[in-house]
Structure formats: C-alpha cells, structure tokens
C-alpha cells in the first residue's frame, strides 16, 4: 500500500484505466493537478481502447496494467 502512495502518477494512470474500461466519461477525472490529470487521461484512453476491443472482465486480465506486471 505504501508503494502506491509513493508513485501518484502511476496510481492516477491505473485509476483512469479502470474508469476507461468500465465505460465512464473522461469528464469525471478527479485530478486537479495538470500532470496527474494527464496521466489519468492517458490511462482512460488506454482503458477505452481495451473496452472497445473487447478486453473487459476476465478476457482483459492480461491487459490490465495493475495485475499483469
């Protein structure tokens, strides 16, 4: 858990990825810091691409950046 707190940009990317895969709008980005917002949007874009390609649920485990390292 402490490792997640150290790298806030990676955490923002992962949260954006999860939002994109689940189909949420990018307007829901919670980040106020411009750099963190950019990382969240990058994750959201990758998540949306995976969502459109059908990598959701169990079929997307190998694509999830938080699980498959």
Swiss-Prot record:
Keyword Oxidoreductase assigned: no
Record-linked Pfam families: RMF
Transmembrane annotation, as ranges: none
One GO location term (cellular component): cytoplasm
UniProt signal peptide: none
Superkingdom in the source lineage: Bacteria
Keywords from the named record: Cytoplasm, Translation regulation
GO biological process: regulation of translation
Subcellular location: Cytoplasm
InterPro entries: Ribosome_modulation_factor (IPR007040), RMF_sf (IPR023200)
Covalent S-S links between cysteines: none
Function: During stationary phase, converts 70S ribosomes to an inactive dimeric form (100S ribosomes).
Family: Belongs to the ribosome modulation factor family.
Protein's recorded name: Ribosome modulation factor
Organism annotation: Hahella chejuensis (strain KCTC 2396)
């Amino acid at each position: 858990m402490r490792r997640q707190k150290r790298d806030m940009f990676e955490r923002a990317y992962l949260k954006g990825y999860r939002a994109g895969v689940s189909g949420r709008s990018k307007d829901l980005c919670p980040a106020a810091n411009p750099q963190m917002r950019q990382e969240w949007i990058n994750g959201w874009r990758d998540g949306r691409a995976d969502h459109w390609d059908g990598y959701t649920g169990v079929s997307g485990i190998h694509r999830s950046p938080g699980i498959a390292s």
